[in-house]
Amino acid sequence: EERRAKRSPLRDVAGMLRSFDYAALDALRDVATTADEWAALAPLAREWAQQSRGAFLQGYADRAKGTPLAGALEPGRGLLGLFELEKALYELRYELKNRPDWVRIPLQGILGVVG
């Protein structure tokens, strides 16, 4: 029954946007072994995530031209922002339960939407 329920494709877009943040910070965790390395590389990881999010949204917007989704692809705003927040809150709950040392990733996502 749940599979047949209509879902907004913006939920999937929000999930993809969140995955870029995870990929960037997971890669950073793999290479930054000291606080100095973290401080030096964190801005690059954030920039990569932002560039990737932007490229994904641009490609999606190009394909969505002429559809109701075309005007709803501004990250952190409207329905897409709500779905991003929903996904980040779900991630926070998951990480607190299973991987507390990863909590930084969803917290940054939450702050990015509400801040």
Region annotations inferred by a language model:
Residues 1-64, 85-100:
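Active-site activation/catalytic loop segments of kinase-like enzymes and analogous catalytic loops
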Residues 69-83:
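All-alpha amphipathic helical-bundle segments outside canonical DNA-binding/catalytic cores
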Residues 45-48, 78, 103-115:
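Short secondary-structure subsegments characteristic of cysteine-rich extracellular domains
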